[in-house]
Amino acid sequence: MRINSELANKFSASTVHLEHITTALSCLTPFGSKDDVLIFIDADGLSFVRENNHVIKIQLLLSRELFMSYSYRNETEDHMKLCVKINHILDSVSVMNRNSDDIVECTLSYDGHGSPFVLIFEDSFISERVEYSTYLIKDFDTNGLELDRERISFEAIIKGEALHSALKDLKEIGCKECYVYAKTEANDENVFALISKSQLGFSKIKLPSNRSILEKLQVFDGDSTTVIDGFAVIGFFDFTSFDKIRKSTKIASKVLFRMDVHGVLSVNILSQTDDVIITDTTRPSNNRPGSIRQLQLPKDYPGIVIEVCMLEKESIDEAAQTEIELLMETNELGNRNSFKKSTIRKRYGTDKGNETSNDNLLQLNGKKIKLPSEEENNKNRESEDEENHCKYPTKDIPIFF
């Protein structure tokens, strides 16, 4: 018997694709499996948002096309938001999906502030209702975690499988800090690499430049429009934060990297709708018929859409930039190619037109430091020598090497 009382709620939606939802919500667990997740509900679907320490944020969208029925009726608000524990929802959906040999239909419902978030699971024999208490918190402070689309420094589209393999390799070698390196040349020799910095030193993973792996790579002059060649863009990130996208890249067909001049990296992950199911080998699975285990997703469903924004750890200095350039010019045999230091986009430089910033690395009081002339130095040294009654020897004494 189907339960129709949920149709009176402001929001209700039904689906049979529980394993797909399990796969999607699992991408949130690296950002805190037992932490709060902020859910936005509107006419287009459900968005799940998590933020960690104001340095990285994930937003995952489940489009309304995933659901057999989808209803959003709210005359006063264009969206509703609530906060729950992500592991509560994930555990309920995954357990019901694995413990039933029948097709399970899941109905989600919510009736606004103060009401519980309800999940109803139904198969041919039973119906189970689960209610989760909800509460409201302030929106996550995303100031500084928004990509400046008018000041993009580079953009790359990468095959998801290749990126996941690279991240897995970085994890296995104990990467602590990660450099993202992007450079284009006029002869279409594009270079996109992930560079590991660990106790073992530097290691680089250079992605193949063929379009089947690196579909697109463009370096901009900091304005999102002017494409330039021969310039390297280098981002520096803490690998603990950077590695949080690895689980999402496992289901990705394509991954879009965009980095702005402020050091914000945006990672857009799009999954294909035909092969996003990931089997959890740590849990026993019932032998269900293949037609039930692999239910066809709706043709108009765009797939799991994920956006991750993260802040650069710090701005790297010129010495580190040169070191990375030398590493990229060294081949697999340890031989260095004809090294030609390329121009690197300085995204944190001071204003060249500001005279108060010239030659003043410490920026003391915003004033320009005046260096003493050689003549003044000689006068000061002579006066000090006279006071100390010291005389320098003549220059006729031979110098021995």
UniProtKB/Swiss-Prot annotation:
GO terms for cellular component: checkpoint clamp complex; nucleus. Residues 371-393 have a biased composition (Basic and acidic residues). It is found in: Nucleus. One of its GO terms (biological process) is DNA repair. Pfam families: Rad1 (PF02144). It comes from the Eukaryota. Coiled coil: none annotated. Gene3D superfamilies: 3.70.10.10. The modification Phosphoserine is found at residue 383. Keywords: DNA damage, DNA repair, DNA-binding, Hydrolase, Nuclease, Nucleus, Phosphoprotein. Residues 367-393 are annotated as: Disordered. One of its GO terms (molecular function) is double-stranded DNA binding. The keyword Metal-binding does not apply. Present with 189 molecules/cell in log phase SD medium. Belongs to the rad1 family. Component of the checkpoint clamp complex involved in the surveillance mechanism that allows the DNA repair pathways to act to restore the integrity of the DNA prior to DNA synthesis or separation of the replicated chromosomes. Associates with sites of DNA damage and modulates the MEC1 signaling pathway and the activation of RAD53 in response to DNA damage at phase G1. The complex also physically regulates DNA polymerase zeta-dependent mutagenesis by controlling the access of polymerase zeta to damaged DNA. Component of the checkpoint clamp complex composed of DDC1, MEC3 and RAD17. The interaction with MEC3 is performed in a RAD17-dependent manner. The checkpoint clamp complex loads onto DNA. Interacts with the DNA polymerase zeta subunit REV7. 2 RAD17 subunits also form a heterotrimer with one MEC3 subunit. This is DNA damage checkpoint control protein RAD17. The gene is RAD17.
